[in-house]
Every structure is written in structure tokens, then in C-alpha cells.
């Protein structure tokens, strides 16, 4: 089977021939095998919208093929964003013609929305690569909360985005976070607790038996006298998942004003620790490691985002406080 290809900023095209062995099968099923880089649902949408022709004519997804027909896929991407390009600095950890991998700082919103019409990651991406205007969501594949820092992958083409979204859906993308939580844990574990929108507060998520599956694995990275640094790995990617799960365990993330409640200061903490905890204005959560298969070629990619300065300072103050506390205890 030979597939001819053409791509430009205005769209892309593919052309191939239906093999004789496919005779009698549904067109959408055969199309999914001919173009495995796209999901079947997306291909079905293109059939219905007239972006796929069989021997130059429109057909339905359920229509049979007979073998030997010419399939022409011609897609002109919809311009799906009203966001304007803005010159906002980006910390790019890796890039090629198919993807960006970046280190998002805390405080940067991913998408424009109510209260954040501009100044977002999407605005920055459109400035960095104007062609992203032709990719849904400007190529964003997954999100991080405004005040969560760390590594994100952005697709630069529709094909790359489709492949990465499929990997997320099939749990082939691995994400590891650094989280600093309240209280000194003695061991790691797994939280398997479904999550849905809070019934009364629409800004919050909540553990609920009627929610969507959510699984978080966590292990101890560093233990302090009244706090713990955890490495958290996600099987699922629900909104606020780690924050909700840690609060559910009654070990909320340091600085999490939404799920952590009032500020909790350890007894007889050092002045430096008190100042640090009172002044830490975002959740102590950092997306540190992202592992995925490259959307073109399927080679494994592993990117590490350095721990940001504010978290490094928090960890340093926690170490100093713990050392002084345990030294006093030994006297």
C-alpha cells in the first residue's frame, strides 16, 4: 500500500488505494487501517464533513468498499482559537517539527477564559509558532493548573495531537509530580478514589462514588518533621487530581488555598519556616517528569523539568527546620 502525502499550513492531504482484501468491509473500518495515525472517531468526522472521498465521491461511514478504490483525504483545519499571539517568554525543554515540550511556570494560565482573556500559555504558543492557530486548542494536549509548574507537551500538527491524545486515553503517557504535603508520612501508597465536580462549589472537585475513575500513586521522596515531599504518578488525569487526593488523605499540599484549608504551622517552627509557609502563595506541586512515545516514529521520550526556585527554597527551609528540631530533641 502506497500513501502519498502533502502538508502545508493550510491543511494536509493523503491519498491511497483500498486493498483488494478489504472488499465487503465498512469504509470507516478500512479507513482506520489505512490511516492509523488518526483516531477512528476523527476519521468518521471527516467522512461526514466531506473531507474524505472514495473514487472522488462522498460516501457514508457504513458503506462497503470493493477493493481498488482511490481514497482521498483532504483536510483544511478549522481555525479554532480567538486568542491573539503575545510575546510571553517560554522555557522550551525540547522541540522538533512535531512537538514542543516546555516547562510552564506557576502563575501562567493555559487557556484564555473568564478572568484570563489573554496572557496565557496559548497566547505565548501562538507567538512562538503561528501555525498552531490551525491546530485545535493551539496544540495543547493536556493541562496544568495555573499555580502548578512543570513539564507539558504541545503538538505542532493535527497528526501529532491526535497521536498524543490517543496515548493519553490509553494511559501510555507517564507523568510524575513533586508534591510537598502537610504532615510527616511514614510510607507511600495508592489513592483509588473517583472524582467529580463539587456539588455546591463549582470551582472545586471532590471525591465521589459517582465520579470518574482517578488513581494516584505516591511514594516518599524526603521526610521532614511535619511535612513530606512526595513523588506522585498518575494513572488518570482528572482535574485537580493530586490536590483532591492528597486532601482526601488529610495531607493537603502546602500552599493549596482551595483544598488545604487554613494555614497550618508546625509547633516551634523556625522563623524562616514560618515566613516561608506564610509567604508561599501557590500549591507546592510541580510536574517533574513526562514520558511519552514520539508521535512520529514512536521512539520513547523522557523529559525532566527542573524543580523551580520557590520549591527549592521551600525544601531547603524544611530541611533546616527539621535538622534543628531533631537536634533539640536529642539534647
UniProtKB/Swiss-Prot annotation:
Give the domain of life: Bacteria
Tell me which family the UniProt entry assigns to this protein: Belongs to the pseudouridine synthase RluA family.
Provide the organism lineage as a comma list. Bacteria, Pseudomonadati, Pseudomonadota, Gammaproteobacteria, Lysobacterales
Q: Has the keyword Membrane been applied to this entry?
A: no
List the protein's name: Ribosomal large subunit pseudouridine synthase D
- Which positions are tagged coiled coil? none
Keywords assigned by UniProt, alphabetized: Cytoplasm, Isomerase, RNA-binding, rRNA processing
What's the Enzyme Commission number for this chain?
Answer: 5.4.99.23
PANTHER family associated with the record: MITOCHONDRIAL RNA PSEUDOURIDINE SYNTHASE (PTHR21600), RIBOSOMAL LARGE SUBUNIT PSEUDOURIDINE SYNTHASE D (PTHR21600:SF44)
Enzyme class of the recorded protein, top EC level: isomerase
Amino acid at each position: 500500500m502506497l500513501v502519498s502525502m502533502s502538508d502545508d499550513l493550510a491543511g494536509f492531504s493523503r491519498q491511497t488505494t483500498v486493498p483488494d482484501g478489504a472488499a465487503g468491509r465498512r469504509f470507516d473500518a478500512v479507513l482506520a487501517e489505512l490511516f492509523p495515525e488518526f483516531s477512528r472517531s476523527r476519521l468518521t468526522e471527516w467522512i461526514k464533513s466531506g473531507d474524505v472521498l472514495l473514487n472522488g465521491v462522498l460516501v457514508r461511514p457504513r458503506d462497503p468498499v470493493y477493493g481498488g478504490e482511490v481514497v482521498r483525504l483532504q483536510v483544511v483545519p478549522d481555525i479554532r482559537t480567538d486568542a491573539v499571539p503575545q510575546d510571553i517568554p517560554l522555557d522550551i525543554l525540547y522541540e522538533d517539527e512535531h512537538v514542543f515540550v516546555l516547562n510552564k511556570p506557576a502563575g501562567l494560565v493555559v487557556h484564555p477564559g473568564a478572568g484570563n482573556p489573554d496572557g496565557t500559555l496559548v497566547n505565548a504558543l501562538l507567538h512562538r509558532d503561528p501555525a498552531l492557530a490551525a491546530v485545535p486548542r493551539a496544540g495543547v494536549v493536556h493541562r496544568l493548573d495555573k499555580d502548578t509548574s512543570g513539564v507539558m507537551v504541545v503538538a505542532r500538527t493535527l497528526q501529532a495531537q491526535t497521536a498524543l491524545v490517543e496515548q493519553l486515553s490509553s494511559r501510555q503517557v507517564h507523568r510524575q509530580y513533586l508534591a510537598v504535603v502537610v504532615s510527616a508520612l511514614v510510607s507511600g501508597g495508592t489513592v483509588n478514589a473517583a472524582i467529580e465536580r463539587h456539588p455546591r462549589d463549582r470551582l472545586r472537585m471532590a471525591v465521589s462514588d459517582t465520579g470518574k475513575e482517578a488513581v494516584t500513586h505516591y511514594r516518599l521522596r524526603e521526610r521532614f518533621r511535619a511535612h513530606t515531599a512526595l513523588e506522585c504518578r498518575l494513572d488518570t488525569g482528572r482535574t485537580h487530581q493530586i490536590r483532591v487526593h492528597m486532601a482526601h488523605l488529610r495531607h493537603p499540599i502546602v500552599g493549596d488555598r482551595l483544598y488545604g484549608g487554613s494555614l497550618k504551622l508546625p509547633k516551634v517552627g523556625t522563623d524562616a519556616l514560618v515566613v516561608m509557609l506564610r509567604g508561599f502563595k501557590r500549591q507546592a506541586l510541580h510536574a517533574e517528569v513526562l514520558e511519552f512515545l514520539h508521535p512520529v516514529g514512536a521512539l520513547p521520550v523522557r523529559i525532566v523539568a527542573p524543580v523551580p526556585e520557590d520549591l527549592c527554597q521551600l525544601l531547603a527551609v524544611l530541611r533546616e527546620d527539621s535538622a534543628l528540631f531533631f537536634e533539640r530533641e536529642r539534647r
